[in-house]
């Protein structure tokens, strides 16, 4: 079997014995740049990697197969998970743990707020979560601008 890739507009497409590799009925396997294409090509040649959903090939197949409906589902999952995010959840009495979390996670949350122009707050009450709809709308708007590959990476990392 001979695997190759060719540049096509803004992406690289992959071929197996000169036939386009498709990940679904309508979607070809794509890469966003030359280095990404070379990593996928390496994985295509390595049979063991094909079953690993977190390999470059596995993530690329996932991203290449996304349609608008799936993109909206993923964004919905990310926004829903934000309501009970473990970095934001601070409703417990363990002072040592709270101090450690404040030290290690607060800079990350501050950076996130600046990067995405939001104001995520700590979850300190089950009934009321101050991470309001406005912040989620801004974040959703940002995520809708991401290409499928960047959204896939964000989704997979946020699900770990």
Model regions and ranges:
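Glycine-rich loop/turn
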Residues: 1-29, 35-47
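Short, charged/polar micro-motifs that form catalytic or ligand-binding hotspots
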Residues: 27-30, 95-98, 151-156
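Generic, well-ordered alpha-helical segments
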Residues: 29-32, 54, 70, 100
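Predominant activation on well-ordered alpha-helical scaffold segments within soluble catalytic domains
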Residues: 38, 106-109, 160
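Short secondary-structure junctions and interdomain/linker hinges
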Residues: 47-51, 85, 115, 119, ...
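A glycine-rich, hydrophobic loop/mini-helix early in the fold
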Residues: 48-91
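Internal, conserved structured core segments that host functional sites
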Residues: 73-135
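A mid-sequence, solvent-exposed acidic-amphipathic segment
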Residues: 119-160
């Amino acid at each position: 079997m001979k695997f190759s890739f060719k540049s096509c507009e803004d992406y690289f497409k992959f071929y197996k014995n000169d036939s386009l590799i498709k990940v679904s009925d309508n979607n070809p396997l794509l890469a966003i740049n030359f280095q990404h294409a070379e990593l996928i090509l390496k994985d295509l040649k390595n049979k063991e990697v094909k079953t690993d959903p977190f390999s470059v090939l596995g993530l690329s197949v996932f991203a290449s197969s996304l349609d608008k409906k799936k993109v909206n589902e993923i964004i919905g999952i990310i926004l829903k998970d934000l309501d009970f995010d473990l970095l934001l959840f601070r409703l417990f009495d363990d002072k040592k743990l709270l101090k450690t979390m404040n030290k290690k996670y607060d800079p990350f949350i501050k950076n996130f707020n600046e990067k995405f122009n939001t104001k995520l707050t700590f979850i300190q009450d089950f009934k009321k979560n101050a991470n309001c709809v406005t912040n989620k709308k801004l974040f959703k708007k940002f995520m809708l601008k991401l290409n499928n590959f960047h959204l896939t990476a964000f989704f997979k990392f946020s699900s770990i």
